[in-house]
A protein has these predicted regions:
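Structural motif detector for alpha-helix initiation sites
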Residues: 108, 125, 228, 295-298
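ABC transporter nucleotide-binding domains
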Residues: 18-21, 28-199, 204-218, 224
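Alpha-helix boundary recognition
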Residues: 91, 130, 192, 208, ...
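Short, charged/small-residue-rich alpha-helical element at the C-terminal edge
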Residues: 237-309, 315
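ABC-family P-loop ATPase nucleotide-binding domain
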Residues: 1-27, 308-315
């Protein structure tokens, strides 16, 4: 019988939380391209870690190394206390990758039954179908599903083995808002059961809502790491939301404004300092309404960090 994550990986004799996945000084090259450069990265038991970065930053490479699908050129890769290719460790991990290819002629329930047969202690098929919101699609062939429905099947296949460590690479791509939030709730429930989740996503709101810790990777290097609030605190910016008769071009010309977005009837204005921009706005439009000022979000912090990294020559 394989011990559970709670038995062997969550605490040591001193009660400290244990690392269940790590990259230590890892370098990975694809020919002349260096995808990861001396990366040090850890995932602790019972947490959700979001790995964020632009396209080509090294996120998927890092995940594939931890899954044992790639080998590092140098450095050490550890998962659940050992080699990621170890069969016992693979029994305790689940993965949902961006490119998940399964036979299109099999029905949803058949896929779940097939994948469950690979594991020693799988979840009941009914529980997997419910967790992925697939109860009404269990007899549908995979090839007849929409893109969002296929994503939900791939999530079901990732969790059917009752994994202790779950890798989710862009899990909510193609999902509508309701389905995305349902998946978030399922991830929270898994963590509540003692599971550990490593998540990559382009949806910054998703990382903000789910992650205990965020690591930002750019051009193969980890450039920032901390809780979502700690990452956001690294960017001293403000977000101004208002309803105004001013045009978007006029708003963009106001000194101190770094970005303007239209959001239904209102505008969202980003700036390092709110007060001078507010004075300018009110001077230009005395009828301005719906005014809200808030701290910069994770998206602004992410953009600032990756742009600064590129400017400083982190290649």
């Amino acid at each position: 019988m394989i011990a559970t994550l709670e038995e062997v990986s969550t605490t040591n004799s001193a009660g400290a939380v244990q690392v269940v996945a790590s990259l230590e000084g890892v370098n990975k090259n694809y020919g002349e391209v260096q995808a990861l450069k001396g990366v040090n990265f850890r995932v602790r038991a019972g947490e959700v870690v979001a790995l964020l970065g632009p396209n080509g930053a090294g996120k998927t490479t890092a995940v594939k190394l931890l899954l044992g699908l790639l080998q590092a050129n140098t450095g050490k890769v550890r998962v659940l206390g050992g080699d990621p290719t170890n069969p016992e460790n693979r029994m305790r991990t689940g993965a949902m990758l961006q490119v998940g290819r399964v036979p299109e002629t099999l029905r949803v329930r058949e896929h779940i039954d097939l994948f469950s047969s690979y594991y020693q202690n799988p979840l009941p098929a009914a529980a997997v179908l419910a967790a992925a919101g697939l109860e009404n699609l269990s007899e549908r062939k995979f090839g007849d599903l929409s893109g969002g429905q296929r994503q939900r099947v791939l999530f079901a296949l990732a969790i059917c083995g009752n994994p202790d460590l779950l890798f989710l690479d862009e899990p909510t791509v193609g999902l509508d808002v309701e389905a995305r939030r349902m998946l978030w709730e399922q991830i929270r429930q898994l963590v509540g059961q003692g599971k550990t989740v490593l998540l990559t996503t382009h949806y910054l709101q998703e990382a903000d809502a789910l992650a205990d810790r965020v690591a930002v990777i750019n051009k193969g290097e980890i450039i920032a790491e901390g809780s979502p609030s700690e990452i956001k605190a690294q960017t001293a910016g403000k977000r101004i939301r208002c309803i105004t008769s001013l045009t978007i071009d006029t708003l963009r010309q106001i000194p101190g404004v770094t970005e303007v977005k239209e959001d239904r009837e209102a505008f969202e204005i980003h700036t390092p300092e709110a007060e001078p921009v507010l004075r300018d706005l009110l001077a230009r439009d005395a009828n301005l309404s719906g005014l809200e000022v808030s701290a910069a979000g994770l998206e602004e912090a992410f953009l600032a960090l990756t742009q600064d990294s590129s400017k400083n020559g982190n290649h």
